[in-house]
Amino acid sequence: MARHDEAKAGGLFDRIGNFVVRWPLIVIGCWIAVAAALTLLLPTLQAQAAKREQAPLPPGAPSMVLQKEMSAAFQEKIETSALLLVLLTNENGLGPADEAVYRKLIENLRADTQDKISVQDFLAVPEMKELLASKDNKAWNLPITFAGDAASPETQAAFKRVAAIVKQTVAGTSLTVHLSGPIATVADLTELGEKDVRIIEIGTAVSVLIILILVYRNLVTMLVPLATIGASVVTAQGTLSGLAEFGLAVNMQAIVFMSAVMIGAGTDYAVFLISRYHDYVRHGEKSDMAVKKALMSIGKVITASAATVAVTFLAMVFTKLEVFSAVGPAIAVAITVSLLGAVTLLPAILTLTGRRGWIKPRRDLTSRMWRRSGVRIVRRSTIHLVGSLIVLVALAGCTLLIRFNYDDLKTVPQHVESVKGYEAMNRHFPMNAMTPMVLFIKSPRDLRTPGALADIEMMSREIAELPNIVMVRGLTRPNGEPLKETKVSFQAGEVGGKLDEATTLLEEHGGELDQLTGGAHQLADALAQIRNEINGAVASSSGIVNTLQAMMDLMGGDKTIRQLENASQYVGRMRALGDNLSGTVTDAEQIATWASPMVNALNSSPVCNSDPACRTSRAQLAAIVQAQDDGLLRSIRALAVTLQQTQEYQTLARTVSTLDGQLKQVVSTLKAVDGLPTKLAQMQQGANALADGSAALAAGVQELVDQVKKMGSGLNEAADFLLGIKRDADKPSMAGFNIPPQIFSRDEFKKGAQIFLSADGHAARYFVQSALNPATTEAMDQVNDILRVADSARPNTELEDATIGLAGVPTALRDIRDYYNSDMKFIVIATIVIVFLILVILLRALVAPIYLIGSVLISYLSALGIGTLVFQLILGQEMHWSLPGLSFILLVAIGADYNMLLISRIRDESPHGIRIGVIRTVGSTGGVITSAGLIFAASMFGLVGASINTMAQAGFTIGIGIVLDTFLVRTVTVPALTTMIGRANWWPSELGRDPSTPPTKADRWLRRVKGHRRKAPIPAPKPPHTKVVRNTNGHASKAATKSVPNGKPADLAEGNGEYLIDHLRRHSLPLFGYAAMPAYDVVDGVSKPNGDGAHIGKEPVDHLLGHSLPLFGLAGLPSYDRWDDTSIGEPAVGHAGSKPDAKLST
């Protein structure tokens, strides 16, 4: 055992070792108490994982934000719910008997008052039948919504009760039931996960047990790591369960993965510690001291290894996807618990079993093989390096063929009930019929306008024309096609139809148009006659007015009735006046009767409006009509009747009295109708103008009829043209779009607007159905195409200031892909930085950590390439999208573990020469690294038996990566590269300096300071080979301390003259002082079960490399100037007696 790798007194592990060795039972008791308390007081980790469903995306993902905005715009409550899809099928066709079973099922579900469920029955809502009944009439879909999260225990319990109701109702009928949907998938995954955990743990434990039997060949030694791992797993699960109570996310994937990682890592730590324990026991240490020294020497390596894995996984808490952020902290906690178990519980168990001799080391069977391997690598380092890199690069190149799978259903076994349900649904319903994408349009403008809806329709039409788009449904196209009523071509056809009807009517009523012409002429003649009568009436009326005026003058003022009595000569004239008034009023009333409709007609006549004469006549006729309506003509008629009734035998007083009343009424009316004579004159003039205008009107009517007949042929041509457009309306390019404002008030529009338009009219949503599988990369790329087309349709429209988004399964998976790419970059950078820093701290160098990081990266890519070959090219399975991230962290971290063990040992051996150090390190650590690698690989290969394909792919890829790393990278690539680089590996530390350069004063002063500050609570253990040497009779005995020329012991000489001793170590024949060189390999292969130095077998020649006086066995070696500056098998240039073909004697 190398002196530089020995247990150093002081420090954390010295104190832990003292405590554990002194009170092992207390340590074991504490572990048992903690594990039991966590198990009894907290729920199981599986129960904690079942309480919440893993969120596929973070809340700030674009698709999640869009969903919230859409729910807010349409005033839909975002409630936690779980969907169950009950698919009822009958391959012979659904009939009345099946409908009766369906109705019975609805009744039974609604009778279930224990569970809060909502059933979408298409029989109760006929409009839903188009979506829930298949076109082939062989399947009905019955969606059932549960209140609560799909993964919560309450919801899962409700699901089991509802599933029982469904199966009992359908049993014995012609219907076949399939249960699918998110809640059914979660139930299946939970059941599979629980089974997988047990199977994986048992299978992994058995495989690890077999490997431990082969490694230790001791039943107790084999069981010690398993006991430590078992206690660590129980404690870690309890710890995670407690942390889950405070919000730590855990899921079944994390649990399964954690179990495999803990078994692998915990066994590795145990193998490292037990192997070092066995080394110390072989070299004569008592069991307790061997436990303590093993912990002191290997504790820092185990801690660095665990820190690498734990910190790397803990960094995943900063990732966005929960598949990483949930697994990372769980693995970090599990690795931390494994480390605590390895440095406390395992040493305590080793202390108890070692005191009783139950874990004695067996003879090492592989050291010689690994030593020869190291010799070959050092001798031909370039060939080994190039050969190993060719293999690694070739395998890594296969990653260029990798294709990722985003469909989680493909990762679940096909025999699972929910998967069968999805397959049956895809057989009977179009792809994405139940889960279309949603195009969401939000605008500051009101979209309930013809222009805005036309722009939305234009956008929808362009989207529908994209490849692999089945249909786009929305307000303007509820069935996937624009409503025919909104097509401009349809509307033009409707106009054409009306014009065609008008043309037919014109043709059918041509004779009536001729009658209209004759009627116009007759009207003109009648109006001419009326004019003559009006002129006569006006003349009489003028006389009446004058007479009445005179009568008013005679009877008005201060005249009395007595004066009228003397005017009896007027009686005859009064009777004549009454007769004239009666005739005139009769004529005026007749004129007013027919003039009223004529005035209305002339008011709406454009011909009359443009003719001044007609307008004047129309005004006069309106005055006559107004006189009749006001009662003026009735008053005059009453006066005429009174005058006509005057009799000779009547007394003048009676007549005058009657006349007095009538005259007052007439006078009162005349006062009300002021200017009647003027109006009568105007009426006479109007009648003349009307008669003259009627002749012109008759001529205009004649011309109008002629023009209408000519229009008939033109209307017929227009009708044929518009009807032709209607016939081509089915072509989208010919259809056009127009929605009249009147349609907004229809019930059909209002009903559709509730689904596709928000209440305030500022948001709209359209459903986009794709023909692609939503979980494919093609569907994700299609999302970008849809958004690009939608965005290109916005400029210069009502939607130019609107925001457009797309929600749906492909959109969410596209977000997952984007977040995965971002998380993967973070994981790679964080892992490389963390591993590099830990290697730098451990090795105190910069060069070696750089190429060690490169080695684990190419090892990871090679493992991923092998996984691609096996699963994708051979088994035909696409790799799950989460595999590269999870496998990267674990392979890099585990590779760093073995790097730390290997390179730290080489560094400790480097003072004796890099090449000798590589040979010794490969020989001494080859078996340990191989055992640890096989154990960890076996734990990962245990995941191959998992039901979930994702875990199987991860287990195989990580397992084969560990095997590749163990047998190729750590045993060939890294040793060869280390040999070629030489002392530059350790730059800029002291070990990286040229040994021929004498130390500076500063170097010597620093060494003296370090020597004074060195603390040693216990004596530093001396190299085992200085304690045991071989006698000629084969028995072990204590060796005396050898002295250097100054007479001081070797260790003192080294401390006081380090520079001298360094040169003595590199002497080709160190006859003295070389005893200070640690060469623990002297006793390799010696078994000392009783600790008395007894051994079996003969010393191999190659073991003499570490002998203090190698007088024999080295004849086959070429001569060296310096052991660490010339590769074995390559003699120094110009050295006498060197032979190019010289070989190391084995």
Curated annotation (Swiss-Prot):
Instruction: Provide the primary localization.
Output: membrane
Output this protein's name: Probable transport protein MmpL12
Q: How does it sit in the membrane?
A: Multi-pass membrane protein
Look up the domain of life of the source.
Bacteria
Identify its protein family.
Answer: Belongs to the resistance-nodulation-cell division (RND) (TC 2.A.6) family. MmpL subfamily.
Q: Which Gene3D superfamilies match?
A: Multidrug efflux transporter AcrB transmembrane domain (1.20.1640.10)
PANTHER family registered for this protein in UniProt: MEMBRANE PROTEIN MJ1562-RELATED (PTHR33406), MEMBRANE PROTEIN YDGH-RELATED (PTHR33406:SF6)
User: What is one Pfam family matched by this protein?
Assistant: MMPL
- State the GO CC annotations: cytosol; peptidoglycan-based cell wall; plasma membrane
Q: Does the keyword Oxidoreductase apply?
A: no
UniProt subcellular location: Cell membrane
Q: Which SUPFAM superfamilies match?
A: Multidrug efflux transporter AcrB transmembrane domain
NCBIfam families referenced in this protein's UniProt entry, alphabetically = actII
Residues crossing the lipid bilayer are 25-45, 206-226, 254-274, 298-318, 330-350, 382-402, 826-846, 850-870, 883-903, 928-948, 949-969
Note the InterPro entries from the entry: MMPL_dom (IPR004869), MmpL_fam (IPR004707), Mycobact_MmpL (IPR050545), SSD (IPR000731)
Which gene is the coding source of this polypeptide chain?
A: mmpL12
Q: Which UniProt keywords apply?
A: Cell membrane, Membrane, Transmembrane, Transmembrane helix, Transport
